[in-house]
């Protein structure tokens, strides 16, 4: 796929993740999209408040759905698009599930595990590490989070 078309696809998938994030109600607005072979196979939003699930992060929700679609917990060849840098819990689940690529929007200096607060994607781990690309549509993703937290004050 030509680079310009790949870049266009990256922004389209991130826009879809952002639209999902906007649909969350009382949860922190984070949306995730999983793509396999050019097709969206799963989506997720934060569901911690709605389902009283401490592990109900958008990435985990989407990965669970993707595993069901693929009938395999190994998500090799999948790309994960998410509006906020994954936390340590999600990053480790991403590594364990063998996701091939992570694309995220806003950096999370408080708990981001793709390099902001921690970096779990380091060489020497016993699993293949995904390619990580951050800061895609960062301003839009950041603004959505700011609006959410301003409304909670």
Q: Which residue ranges define each predicted feature?
A:
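Zinc-dependent deaminase
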Residues: 1-27, 73, 89-153
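Short beta-strand scaffold segments in enzyme catalytic cores
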Residues: 30-38
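Short, charged low-complexity linear segments at domain edges
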Residues: 59-73
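Residues that line or immediately flank small-molecule/substrate-binding pockets and catalytic motifs
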Residues: 48, 82, 106
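Short beta->alpha transition motifs characteristic of CBS
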Residues: 41-48
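A short, polar/charged loop-to-alpha-helix boundary motif
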Residues: 50-61
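Immediate flanking context of iron-sulfur cluster ligation sites
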Residues: 72-84
